[in-house]
């Protein structure tokens, strides 16, 4: 005991003490050994991150800025602006200026809120921020140019930033969220209240999904639900592009369901949409087990969420989904432990302060690569802080 007391526990050991893996006691010949072994390996390799100074995400900033270590020249920036790959912003003497054009004004407003929150601590700089759904800088593009986008795949060099949706700007879901999901700090409180009303033991053990057909990758789950409704309750809802029942796989569109009502279910599915799905972070706060389909599209906080530690990874074609659902139903304690870790990560590391902190760190580091002094464009206007938004 004396020797043990003097040993330094590695982070993964501490994690196992906090969240013991019940499955470790199962027979090695268990039907579910493959999945249990994956969980054990994931926990052994997992390094919990600090809550200080949003340090969880420093690696993301470093990786995204690596292509620009040779410097960002005035000529390079002029080319980005000329191509109109996003909205051009300038920060000069702690004031924010912008060109008049913005494709989605509410999205720009959501971005501007966070920049204005930290602008007193930022040096002069300029940047192009893309508020479209899709990234703009494929890796084959030469030269690599700096464009900020909220989401990307490994095939892009875009610099990720926390999406406008943490404050405002959609996506609109009629009639539940006509102006978007609203402020993240307020919505998370609603979700946590709902989670408290639906503890694990009271949740429905049918897997659940409601969403529009923004990607055909969602089809197999809808079809499985029609075949086995006790296993999965999944239906398509309408979106702005809906024209006929063909857009909901031959069935009438289901009604939209408020995200707080998702908390009634143990197992919740997340799919990509056009890009990364905005629902992902919300699902964890239900205290439910998140099934994350595919790993291609990411936002800035995704890399620190680990498969088998915080969520159940599902193949893009959903070929493994039935077996995974059978596994979690047969190993309820394991499922609950993963759900707890996922929920705690979002609670601890994706607070509004973390979003603001990320913006500050990102822009501060980015500014170091500008190889010239920024000159204000005369036709740009100053963005003034607006009155605090509190509506959902």
Swiss-Prot record:
Keyword tRNA processing annotated: no
Cited SMART domains: CAP10
Pathway entry: Protein modification; protein glycosylation
Superkingdom field: Eukaryota
Biological process according to GO: axial mesoderm development; circulatory system development; gastrulation; muscle tissue development; paraxial mesoderm development; positive regulation of Notch signaling pathway; protein O-linked glycosylation; protein O-linked glycosylation via serine
Annotated site residues (Interaction with the consensus sequence C-X-S-X-[PA]-C in peptide substrates) in this chain: 132, 240
Coiled-coil ranges (or none): none
EC number: 2.4.1.376, 2.4.2.63
Disulfide-linked positions: 49-56, 54-357, 102-108, 263-286
Positions of region (Interaction with the consensus sequence C-X-S-X-[PA]-C in peptide substrates): 103-107, 172-178
Catalyzed reaction equations: L-seryl-[EGF-like domain protein] + UDP-alpha-D-xylose = 3-O-(beta-D-xylosyl)-L-seryl-[EGF-like domain protein] + UDP + H(+); L-seryl-[EGF-like domain protein] + UDP-alpha-D-glucose = 3-O-(beta-D-glucosyl)-L-seryl-[EGF-like domain protein] + UDP + H(+)
GO cellular component: endomembrane system; endoplasmic reticulum lumen
Keyword Glycosyltransferase: yes
InterPro entries: CAP10, O-Glucosyltr/Glycosyltrsf_90
Cellular compartment(s): Endoplasmic reticulum lumen
Binding site for UDP-alpha-D-glucose: 177, 212, 218, 274-279
GO molecular function terms noted in the UniProt entry: EGF-domain serine glucosyltransferase activity; EGF-domain serine xylosyltransferase activity; glucosyltransferase activity; UDP-glucosyltransferase activity; UDP-xylosyltransferase activity
Alphabetized UniProt keyword annotations: Developmental protein, Disulfide bond, Endoplasmic reticulum, Gastrulation, Glycoprotein, Glycosyltransferase, Signal, Transferase
Principal location: endoplasmic reticulum
Catalytic center residues: 133 (proton donor/acceptor)
Residues making up the signal peptide according to the UniProt record: 1-23
Pfam family, one: Glyco_transf_90
Annotated function: Dual specificity glycosyltransferase that catalyzes the transfer of glucose and xylose from UDP-glucose and UDP-xylose, respectively, to a serine residue found in the consensus sequence of C-X-S-X-P-C. Specifically targets extracellular EGF repeats of protein such as CRB2, F7, F9 and NOTCH2. Acts as a positive regulator of Notch signaling by mediating O-glucosylation of Notch, leading to regulate muscle development. Notch glucosylation does not affect Notch ligand binding.
Family membership noted in the UniProt record: Belongs to the glycosyltransferase 90 family.
Name of the molecule in the record: Protein O-glucosyltransferase 1
